[in-house]
Each structure stands twice: as structure tokens, then as C-alpha cells.
Amino acid sequence: MSAIVDVIAREILDSRGNPTVEADVLLESGVLGRAAVPSGASVGTREAVELRDEDAQRYFGKGVLKAVENVNTEISEAIMGLDAMDQAFIDRTLIDLDGSGNKSRLGANAILSVSLAVAKAAAEECGLPLYRYVGGAGSMSMPVPMMNVINGGAHANNNIDMQEFVIIPLGAQSFREALRCGAEVFHTLKGLLDKRGMHTAVGDEGGFAPDLPNNEAALQLIVEAIENAGYLPGPDVAIGLDCAASEFYRDGKYHLESDGLALDSTQFADYLATWIDKYPIISIEDGMSEHDWDGWKLLTSRLGKSVQLVGDDIFVTNASILKEGVSQGIANSILIKLNQIGTLTEALYAIESAKRAGYTAVVSHRSGETEDTTIADIAVASNALQIKTGSLSRSDRLAKYNQLLRIEEDLGDTASYPGRGAFYQLK
């Protein structure tokens, strides 16, 4: 009854108005699984490749009809009749069918849409929520949210170099409390910006995108907002950064245009260390460029015992690259973006590989999202303990938070919220 009898893909639009792929997988029992894939703005060079049409006459070349066609023909034919309960076998079938090594032939967007839709169909067939189907009985830990309240870099049209400034509710006793805390700080921050005549328009991920005197001004505003909302910076609400340093790394220097600085790796590590001494920063993502492995080693040696150092562009959710990073003492955490690797099985393997190495894993959205809430379930299923899925505005972001509220309600008294325990790699 769990045999796949039909696979249908279509072109839909993401939160930036760009095309993306949505797939339906129908089982013999009549059960349907549906999944839509996201798309990133700052993209690691070793990510799995999403397939775009490159037809300038349509969506400025960003159409995905080729990927849709690949699902409706080759992929559909390859998995028709297979058992949806065998996720690993189906994902391996998709990887082998593509044959390219980086999913560039069929498209990671095509492959991932089917991989996730299969899992959702199988969960429905079993009468289980997705988090329980994927994770089993041991999935009871809610993730600590990393909420993007100020956007910059490639995610906003402003003068801030750093891509994300996030708030992290550590002192809450439940996910519901953490979400309320984040919302209160978010609205307090909006009031501060408005009072000072700054823009309160939001960026791709729902955070505010004001022009500021320099990068540090964002940290000052966030600390003030935390305090004005009635919380303690640090114990109640910590701060995280996504530098997205690859975006401003050129010719061996980190170019911080809002500060008028061009820093080498040592100087940029010093720059970040100064912030850590002044502000309650517990996490830094992509603190060095993906092309600056020596800089990453320096940063990890300098800060890795006191701050979570998350590798996004450098690891691209790839367990093999993570293994290389672990062996060289690079970072202490990995960001998990499903479309960076292209199948559910590979993403879950990357999470497990990180845990075995003593690294944390942060399940993440992309800047171009849809209403699909799969990553909320995956964060709980994998006991990843952390999730990064945007700010407290834009329904494409809130959809994930609301799904986590439902999951916590479903878990009842068995649900746990780890707070600072989510950062178990820190001394």
C-alpha cells in the first residue's frame, strides 16, 4: 500500500517571487505527500546545484521548468513502484540517477522536492506526524530558535556588511516562551528604530533592514531592545551573527564597507573577538570565508571554546567536507540546509556526523522560502537542538515557528527546551 504510483512536480513561487519546485508523491493507498524547496541568496561554491532554465525571456532566466520536467519524467519513472517507507533506498536511487556528484544534471531542487515529498507521504501512510516518522520515539527536544532581527549583506538593500544579527532566547522554559520572548524583543526593536527615524522595512528573512552608522550599531540596538523588553542580555537572550564573510572577502581581505575597513584574517578575528568581549554573543556563523581555511583555523583556535562557530558556506551540509573540517580543527558547528545537499538522507547523515564529532547542528531555512514547514519537523526529528528560520514577520518564516508550536503541543509534557544546553560544545 505504500508503493509510489505517481509523482507530479510544478513550478511555484518562493518568498522573493522567484520560481521554485514543488512535488507531489502519491501512494497506492491514495495518500499524498507534498514538498516545496527553498533557494539561497549567498550560496556556497560547493553546494548541490539547483537547476534553472536560463531563459532570459521567462522570469529573467530563473524559471525551473527543466527541473519540473526532470521530476515528471526521469525521476518519476525511476521511483515508480518503490516503497515510500524506504527513504534511504529512494534517495540513493535519486543520487545514482543524477550521476553528477553535485546533482547538477537533474537539479538539486528537483531531487530534494521528491525526497521530502516521499518522506511526507510515508509519514501520512503511517498516520504519524513527520517529526515522529523521521525521528522515532526519541524526538522530544524542541530547538532553540535563532531569530534574525536585523538583516544586512545579501539579504537586504542597506549598508550593513554582516548578513544577519539574530536573537537567541536561552532563558525560556519552553519553545512557546522562547517564541514570545523573541516577538517581544522584535517589536521593541521596531519601536526603537521608529523612534529614531530609521527604516522599519524588512529584508528577505523578515528582520529589519535599516541603514546604520556601522556594523556594531546593530549590536547596540539589539542589546537596548532586549533590555527595554524586560530581559537580560546574555542569560535571557543571547546574540548570534551570520557574517557571511565570503560575501565581502576579496583579494585576501575582509572588506567592511560600512566601517571603512579592509582586514586580513588575523585582524578580522580580532575585530570579532572585540565584539564578543563587549556583547553577549554566543554564536558566529561563517566568521571567515569558505576560501580562507587558514582564517577558519585561526578563528576556531581563538574563539572556539567560548563561542559557537557555525560553518555554512564552508561545509554546505556535506558530511565529507565536515569530516575534513573536523580533522583540521575548523569550526565547532554545522549549518544544515536541506537544499545544499539535496536529499533528506544526506542531511540527516550530516547532522549525525556533526554530533559524533562533538559539533552542534543548526537546521536552517534559506532566504528564498515557501510556506513549506518541513524543516521544523526535521529540527525536532533529528534532535538538532537549534533552528534558524528567520524573524518574527513574513508568513514564510512564521509558518515554521507555528509548526513548532504545534509539535510542542503534540509532545505535551514530554517536550523539552534545552536553552543554553543546545550549545553543548562550549566549555
From Swiss-Prot:
Pathway terms, separated by semicolons: Carbohydrate degradation; glycolysis; pyruvate from D-glyceraldehyde 3-phosphate: step 4/5
Catalytic activity: (2R)-2-phosphoglycerate = phosphoenolpyruvate + H2O
GO MF, one example: phosphopyruvate hydratase activity
InterPro entries: Enolase, Enolase-like_C_sf, Enolase-like_N, Enolase_C, Enolase_CS, Enolase_N
Cofactor(s) listed in the protein's UniProt record: Mg(2+)
Sequence positions that bind Mg(2+): D242, E285, D312
EC number: 4.2.1.11
CDD domains: enolase (cd03313)
Gene3D superfamilies referenced in this protein's UniProt entry, alphabetically: Enolase-like C-terminal domain, Enolase-like, N-terminal domain
Principal location: cytoplasm
Binding-site positions, (2R)-2-phosphoglycerate: Q163, K337, R366, S367, K388
Disulfide topology: none
PANTHER family, per database record: ENOLASE
Protein task: Catalyzes the reversible conversion of 2-phosphoglycerate (2-PG) into phosphoenolpyruvate (PEP). It is essential for the degradation of carbohydrates via glycolysis.
Family annotation (NCBIfam families): eno (TIGR01060)
HAMAP family assigned: Enolase
Protein name as annotated: Enolase
Lineage: Bacteria, Pseudomonadati, Pseudomonadota, Betaproteobacteria, Nitrosomonadales
Name of the gene this protein is made from: eno
